[in-house]
């Protein structure tokens, strides 16, 4: 039973700072600065009104969701065949290539900011969804190949052979047999990919100006402009947090099966 | 048929060349140039590299980074593994725990910084007030010690859930029969952990350790918002230093050289850990 | 080396929820000291659940488990001295074979010198000497399963060993060798054994007595011979034997003052004892006869009324015999009969069948009817 308390204690540790921010977002600045209250005594929605009345925020939301989704699509399409190749065939240099793919995840985004800017300027992609969605493949593609390879290796090769003997063509085998088998793996991969793309700031900030600005960037820029208005800042933080919470809540069952299939 | 693997790798290779390879070439190119605003770039060989390796600030940032990543690994991995073992295996508790654990992961990194900033600031935060009540004077903006452990606590708060999720997946894959056999064989909880849980989790733990190692090296936005790298430069890590060189500084060539050195260090450490972990516990036999 | 007794066991999964399922109901079973027993039944009949209740991995919802008369229901597996071999080889991968065998002894605080002695004994018996210091991951499922077995019987105080379909991962060709070594070990140490399987051949060759379960209930616990010759109900009759017993639905008529079984136009005599137990008001009756007991004749038996005309519909080669399926004329009842492999017979041929009365079982409402 004490194991449970250990978990609960940690979940409380997760929630306390979040609660403090949510609590603060409903307080006027006078209350925030003058006394320490565990719940808002002078409850107000003014902080939220200030943010939500701005066109920037709504656009930021939509931009973020679209970019992260595009990134998930790119990464999944490229990672599935690559992971299949690594899990099924031995070919010259496969181990080296696999590690080389992984090293891309170690690349510091800071190092790639300037080259990215130059490259995407030349391609005329700056301030479009494409730029960010492609740039985020830098750290998401290696991760996706890595995780999917694990899931695929867990599926015996005999299944492939049986399917081909039964007369399935390769596309038919993939669609009808293989993909359904690793669906939970795809779910976990897509979740992690989306997550890392959703929260990334540095590259997104470098590659967008106004039209394609994601929410993380909107947040930083509005902070810079408005100074440290704590109430508004907290409300902005809450707003930036909500989509993530909704996503985890929606996919929780998929995650539970994916993670309990247990091949990461 | 020999070309088949490469055909399958083609999309990934294309994507990597746009997102990594071409930029990396550019970085390499810059690293050997002296680029000053208003003048023509000229080739300066390894000059940039030497200058950085001799820079006190770089060495200090690297030292801090290594210590920080080390602390991250020795706290988050055992903590995450323990929490994963404490997770319910089925029932409504699973979904609830997953949702709560997923929240920190899906908060934009600068917002993580904001959450912890409002949580720990001496004028508006509840943490300093709580410490004050216990008689400890908490000062994130002036005490190096407080700043350090707060950044570490924030990282634990932010990233331990990822370790939990990965380990949880691994634990779920261990057949229940192993635990039944251990019970029948009168194994103590420690021996069950040592001979059942741990050997079966090796692959998963390699992933968790490498992922945390690589990502802890990249930590940037959170401490930037929380402490601004201070007090002084006591929480300025390698990534912060690198991006200061790459964007903040005038010398783009130097920034590029910093990035490459940084890149090299991470790959080296990851590779060593990868090899060590792969061979660990392998003495008695093969993999799985 | 103990007597295992389960008393009035009932086990319910997910009690009180929508998924509530009764896995085991009202099971009583006593395994005598030092005997080899099997637990046989179709998948999902509750075999594994019963096994786990005996080993202590599961707590029964109701009932008791007794070892040598002592109630151990509340005791954890470690205190029951019962070993279990699982469906697939459960091996501690990070230790070599020696370490695996030593594991339960070390956990019990046995001195190293004694451990070595025990391991030597077990290794001799199971022929594991050559691989004692190999890593189990390179050995393949057969040897690993033997190591798991060795780990089960290595403790001097092992009172019983339970097998949960241990041959699932073993190649058919090697099953015989493995089973031989298992059997030898059981005899050598005089261990009470319970072997769970859904393969009757495996059960009957391993065990002196076989318990058959169905839908969570124990149907019959008996020797192989009795199961074959005196099944308590139609399920056992059909389940044991390959092919199983012919079960022919029949009505009852009165002939010469005694009730007779009637299939279509054919009257069938059963043994006198059973005739006296029959009641004309019964419906839902079956007669049962083993395919090997059916007499087949191609020549017309003329006036012998014990023969029933039939038409062959199928002839199959099974093992060293031919199994022929024939339909009794003027009915849609099919009967299987076993004839020698060189018996000349073809499909669509008319034949005559005789059911010797002493070999016929009679079932009323699926239960066997015996002499009053």
Identify the residue ranges that each predicted region occupies:
Chain C
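Conserved ABC transporter NBD signature motif
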Residues: 63-71
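Pre-Walker A (P-loop) beta-loop-beta motif of ABC nucleotide-binding domains
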Residues: 27-38, 92
């Amino acid at each position: 039973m004490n194991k449970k308390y250990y978990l609960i204690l940690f979940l409380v540790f997760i929630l306390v700072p979040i609660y403090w921010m949510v609590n603060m977002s409903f307080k006027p600045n006078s209350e925030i600065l003058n006394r320490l209250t565990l719940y808002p005594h002078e409850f107000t929605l003014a902080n939220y009104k200030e943010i939500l009345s701005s066109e920037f925020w709504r656009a930021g939301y939509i931009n973020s969701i679209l970019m992260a989704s595009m990134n998930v699509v790119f990464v999944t399409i490229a990672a599935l065949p690559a992971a299949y190749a690594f899990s099924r065939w031995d070919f010259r240099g496969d181990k080296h290539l696999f590690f080389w793919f992984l090293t891309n995840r170690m690349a510091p985004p800071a190092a790639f900011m300037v080259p990215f800017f130059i490259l995407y300027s030349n391609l005329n992609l700056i301030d479009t969804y494409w730029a960010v969605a492609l740039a985020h493949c830098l750290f998401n593609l290696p991760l996706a190949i890595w995780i999917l390879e694990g899931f695929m290796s867990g599926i015996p090769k005999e299944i492939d052979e049986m399917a081909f003997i039964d007369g399935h063509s390769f596309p038919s085998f993939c669609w009808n047999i293989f993909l359904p088998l690793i669906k939970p793996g795809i779910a976990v991969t897509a979740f992690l990919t989306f997550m890392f793309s959703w929260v990334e700031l540095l590259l997104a900030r470098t590659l967008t100006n106004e039209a394609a600005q994601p929410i993380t960037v909107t947040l930083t820029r509005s902070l810079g402009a408005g100074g440290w208005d704590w109430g508004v800042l907290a409300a902005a933080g809450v707003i930036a947090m909500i989509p993530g919470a909704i996503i985890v809540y929606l996919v929780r069952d998929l995650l539970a099966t994916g993670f309990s299939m247990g091949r990461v | 048929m020999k070309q088949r693997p490469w055909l399958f790798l083609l999309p990934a290779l294309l994507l990597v060349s746009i997102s990594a390879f071409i930029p990396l070439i550019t970085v390499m190119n810059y690293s050997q140039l002296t680029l000053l605003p208003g003048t023509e770039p000229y080739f300066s060989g390894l000059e940039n590299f030497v200058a950085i390796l001799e820079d006190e600030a770089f060495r200090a940032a690297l030292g801090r980074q290594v210590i920080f990543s080390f602390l991250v690994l020795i706290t988050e991995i055992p903590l995450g593994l323990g929490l994963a073992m404490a997770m319910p295996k089925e029932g409504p508790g699973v979904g609830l725990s997953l949702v709560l654990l997923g929240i920190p992961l899906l908060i934009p990194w600068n917002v993580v910084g904001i959450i912890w900033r409002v949580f720990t600031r001496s004028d508006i935060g509840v943490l300093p007030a709580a410490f004050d009540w216990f008689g400890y004077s908490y000062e994130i903006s002036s005490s190096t010690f407080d700043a350090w452990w707060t950044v570490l606590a924030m990282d634990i708060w932010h990233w331990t859930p990822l370790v939990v999720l990965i380990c949880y997946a691994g634990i779920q894959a261990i057949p229940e029969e192993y635990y039944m056999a251990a019970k029948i064989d009168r194994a103590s909880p420690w021996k069950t952990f040592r001979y059942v849980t741990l050997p079966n989790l090796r692959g998963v733990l390699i992933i968790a350790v490498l992922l945390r190692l690589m990502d802890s090296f990249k930590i940037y936005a959170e401490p930037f918002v929380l402490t601004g790298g201070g007090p002084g430069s006591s929480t300025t890590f390698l990534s912060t230093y690198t991006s200061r060189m790459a964007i903040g500084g005038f010398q783009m060539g130097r920034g590029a050289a910093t990035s490459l050195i940084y890149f090299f260090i991470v790959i080296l450490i990851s590779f060593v850990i990868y090899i060590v972990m792969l061979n660990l516990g392998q003495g008695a036999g093969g993999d799985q | 080396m103990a007597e295992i007794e389960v008393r009035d066991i009932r086990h319910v999964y997910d009690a009180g929820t929508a998924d509530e399922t009764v896995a085991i109901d009202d099971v009583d079973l006593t395994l005598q000291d030092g005997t080899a027993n099997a637990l046989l039944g179709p998948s999902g009949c509750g075999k594994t659940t019963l096994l786990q209740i005996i080993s202590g991995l599961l707590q029964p919802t109701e009932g008791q488990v007794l070892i040598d008369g002592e109630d151990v229901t509340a005791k954890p597996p470690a205190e029951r001295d019962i070993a279990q071999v699982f469906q697939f080889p459960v091996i501690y991968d990070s230790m070599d074979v020696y370490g695996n065998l030593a594991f339960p002894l070390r956990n019990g605080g046995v001195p190293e010198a004694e451990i070595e002695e025990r391991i030597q004994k077990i290794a001799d018996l199971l022929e594991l000497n050559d691989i004692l210091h190999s890593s189990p991951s390179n050995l393949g499922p057969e040897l690993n399963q033997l190591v798991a077995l060795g780990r089960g019987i290595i403790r001097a105080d092992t009172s019983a060993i339970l097998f949960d379909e241990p041959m699932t991962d073993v190649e058919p060709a090697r099953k015989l060798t493995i089973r031989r070594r298992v059997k030898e070990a059981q005899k050598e140490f005089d261990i009470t054994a319970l072997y769970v399987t859904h393969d009757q051949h495996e059960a009957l060759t391993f065990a002196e007595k076989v318990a058959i379960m169905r839908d969570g209930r124990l149907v019959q616990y008996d020797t192989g011979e009795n199961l074959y010759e005196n099944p308590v109900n139609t399920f056992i009759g059909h389940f044991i034997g390959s092919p199983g017993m012919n079960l022919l639905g029949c009505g009852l008529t009165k002939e010469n003052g005694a009730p007779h079984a009637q299939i279509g136009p054919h009257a069938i005599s059963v043994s006198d004892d059973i005739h006296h137990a029959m009641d004309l008001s019964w419906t839902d009756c079956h007669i049962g006869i083993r395919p090997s007991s059916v007499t087949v004749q191609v020549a017309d038996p003329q006036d012998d009324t014990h023969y029933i005309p039939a038409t062959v519909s199928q002839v199959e080669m099974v093992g060293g015999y031919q199994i022929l399926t024939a339909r009794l004329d003027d009915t849609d009842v099919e009967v299987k009969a076993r004839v020698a492999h060189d018996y000349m017979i073809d499909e669509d041929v008319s034949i005559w069948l005789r059911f010797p009365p002493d070999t016929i079982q009679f079932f009323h409402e699926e239960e066997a009817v015996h002499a009053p």
